Amino acid sequence: MNTLINNTIRFSVSTLSCAVLATAMVACDGSSAPQVKATAGIPAGLISKGPATGTGVSAVKATAKQGETITLVGRIGGSEDPFGQDRAVFTIVDPALKSCSDAGDPDHCATPWDYCCEDRGALKRGTATIEITDSNGRPLKVAVRGMSGLDPLAVVAVTGTVSEQNDAGLLVVRATKIEVR
């Protein structure tokens, strides 16, 4: 029985390692994900240009409660691809944190919006997930990357309802308004 469990764990770790390696190899080749320009399914007026001002992600996370309406400001990023695949979901990072492009060496990193140069603990405390949902609270089935200025490192102010928040650092906001600077 122990051999079966050990083999299963080895296979799982091996498979996960291959997936991570493949992702890293794609990230290093300098290519970027395709830009999506369609706005199908997004409520009119939900995304607009504006000053994108408000309180940073870290400060909001410290006091946010599930069910309350909040406004927070951040830059789109936090991972190699901060956008959900074919879903209206993305992550934002507190503007006080520095992306790799803020380090002064433009050739340092092919994906500066992943914040790989930032402390992992600070990044976890300063990241929030934003969802644009249907009437049932499910993320819309539309990719939002490139839509109305929603691009990596864009500064956004998001107003919405806290749908999830926990002590492990998770904050999910259902957006009712997004301003893109």
Placement of each model-derived feature along the sequence:
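C-terminal motif of bacterial Sec signal peptides marking the signal peptidase cleavage site
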Residues: T23-A27
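Bacterial N-terminal signal peptides that target proteins for export
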Residues: N2-S17
